[in-house]
Amino acid sequence: GAPDLYFSEFTNATGWVHAGDKAIGGRLVKTDDETRLVAQLWGAVPEDMAKLAVHCKELGFVGIDINMGCPDASAVKAGGGAGMIRTPELAAEMIAAAKTAGLPVSAKTRLGYSLVDEWRNWLTHILHQDVENLTVHLRTKKEMSKVPAHFELIPEIVALRDEIAPDTLLTINGDVEDREQGLKIVADNPGVDGVMIGRGIFHNPFAFEHEPATHYRDELLDLLRLQLDLYDKHSHLTNRPFDTLKRFFKIYVRDFTGAAELRDKLMHTKSTDEVRALLAND
């Protein structure tokens, strides 16, 4: 199975405006066969957001998603990500700026900055901006991912959307591990239009399969080989060092005899060819 829609890594608009593609590390590289890809952008300067949104349209993205929920300290310090929750009027300006490119614009955010009770005022404000879709991560910025997502708030959030912006789609995010769980969330909460899976894919690379199944060593390692091939194919565009691949090894090298030892060896490799050689000899 595959997702119905994909989102790029979140990309800083101001960084791109001032330094070009080299500033964004290949985050907006798009191939012709990627036809359902939304560009997720962040920033705190409306003029820069407008410029990058136009560029994304030229690249062939099908929409713009503004990240107003990332808790990363550097993004928040710059006024972006979850920092937008503290500047609601600027958030509205960023959405309006993105719309000037003519693509559908959505927003991804959290319940609030520090307190869960912030959710009603904050989401009310965003829903008044006439976004195509609102994705709500069911935690605050302060909570990060340290507490369970507040699924109990979904019915109230649905009711708020229905009252203010019934045409805005509502997507739920946070602690959604796979397609099966996502479908249950939708079934249990009439009015929810979809779910977004983020970190879940790092725990289970088969998160989107329609029929959950047990996957064994060879299948997991073949997926790792595929990622190595894709890295080699696109590395001239993304310009990312080999070591950035290492954080993905644990996704595939797990849950089989000798996985820990193999993973340790892989962490000492210096090229994709070294990884392939280790896998071939293991």
Model-predicted segments: where are they?
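Conserved beta-strand positions in the central sheet of alpha/beta enzyme cores
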Residues: 6-7, 40, 65, 106, ...
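Short secondary-structure boundary segments
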Residues: 9-10, 68, 138, 198-199
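Alpha/beta enzyme core
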Residues: 50-64, 68-78, 89-170, 189
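An active-site metal/cofactor-coordinating segment within enzyme catalytic domains
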Residues: 21-22, 28-31, 73-84
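Glycine-rich, positively charged N-terminal anion/phosphate-binding segment
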Residues: 1-58
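Short glycine-enriched, charge-decorated loop/helix-capping segments at active-site entrances
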Residues: 79-85, 143-144, 212-214
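Short gly/pro/ser/thr-enriched loop/turn and capping motifs at secondary-structure boundaries
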Residues: 13-15, 72, 142, 201-204
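Alpha/beta catalytic cores of nucleotide-metabolism and tRNA/nucleoside-modifying enzymes
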Residues: 119-123, 127-133, 152, 156-172, ...
